């Protein structure tokens, strides 16, 4: 537990303390990523609800971080609320869900989401029951580099993304001997391809700052050409799709699209909970998210390599 947490969280906490030592205003945000199929699988194995699983691990992780000496218990900076603070939140937070749904509807209204039929793997049991398999529960051979442990829609080895039918020799990770097949299912896709030019310019402006592996993965993705990415999935455990139509009743907002917004939602939730004495009150989060005259604003992210695409391509891309 401690080694796993240390690699991700200690560098961020060190940076937070360094920025404070320099006299700067700083807000540190993170939290527990609590949606997706791995949670439901654990719940089924333990015979408990998904909410019980995430409640247990959020408590364990939050305590472990504080025990490591991280500053998550210091919600308000000791210099005053105007200097910031920290919040370790969670994606099952009701406000996180509400803000994510607000953003989802804004993108829909701006015509940045499109309905599209996609092919998705599903597992068929002996009685003919169908269970759709999330991408990370399908493994096979990458059609680009030949990696034999590629996931259903992405290869972590070369960074390639592809459609379900393009993966070679697919099998269910949880049940390798099960019969699997591809079936059509309708989902909403984020028009990421419309931001190709903007993201290429953004990438060029960051070349002297990003690490070599980030630059390489970015170049690879952009050279392949960005494609629309699904923002909904056939999952029960997740944030409901906020569309009043029975077509979307059994679908949830895709976790990669939802969780990456946690940095933004966490800042807003921090302001709503702790910034009552700040001059801007619940809008205090804007000081860390909106560039203003005579203000130098900077974001620093600490993450695993598998999160690079989400942070690079989905975080900077919305118009508003």
List where the protein language model places each region.
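Structured secondary-structure scaffolds
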Residues: 3-30, 98, 145, 154, ...
């Amino acid at each position: 537990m401690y080694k796993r947490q240390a690699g991700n969280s200690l560098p961020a906490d060190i940076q937070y303390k360094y920025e404070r030592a320099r006299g700067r205003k700083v807000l540190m945000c993170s939290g527990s990523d609590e949606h997706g199929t791995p949670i439901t699988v654990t719940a089924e194995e333990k015979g408990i609800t998904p909410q019980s699983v995430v409640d247990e691990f959020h408590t364990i992780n939050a305590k472990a971080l504080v025990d490591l000496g991280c500053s998550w218990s210091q919600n308000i900076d000791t210099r005053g609320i105007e200097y910031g603070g920290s919040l370790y939140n969670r994606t099952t937070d009701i406000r996180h869900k509400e803000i994510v749904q607000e953003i989802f509807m804004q993108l829909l209204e701006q015509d940045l989401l499109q309905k599209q039929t996609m092919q998705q793997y599903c597992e068929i049991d002996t009685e003919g029951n169908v269970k759709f398999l999330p991408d990370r529960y399908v493994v096979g051979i990458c059609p680009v580099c030949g990696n034999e442990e590629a996931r259903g829609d992405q290869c972590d080895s070369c960074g390639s993304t592809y459609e379900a039918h393009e993966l070679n020799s697919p099998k269910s990770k949880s049940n390798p001997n099960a019969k699997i097949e591809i079936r059509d299912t309708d989902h909403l896709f984020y028009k990421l391809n419309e931001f190709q030019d903007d993201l290429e310019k953004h990438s060029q402006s960051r070349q002297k700052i990003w690490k070599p592996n980030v630059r390489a993965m970015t170049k690879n993705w952009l050279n392949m050409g960005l494609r629309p990415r699904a923002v909904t999935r056939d999952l029960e455990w997740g944030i409901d799709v906020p569309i009043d139509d029975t077509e979307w009743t059994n679908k949830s907002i895709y976790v990669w699209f939802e969780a990456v917004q946690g940095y933004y939602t966490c800042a807003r939730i921090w302001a709503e909970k702790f910034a009552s004495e700040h001059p801007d009150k619940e809008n205090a989060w804007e000081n860390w998210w909106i560039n203003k005259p005579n203000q130098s604003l900077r974001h620093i992210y600490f993450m695993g390599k598998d999160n690079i695409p989400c942070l690079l391509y989905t975080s900077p891309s919305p118009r508003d």
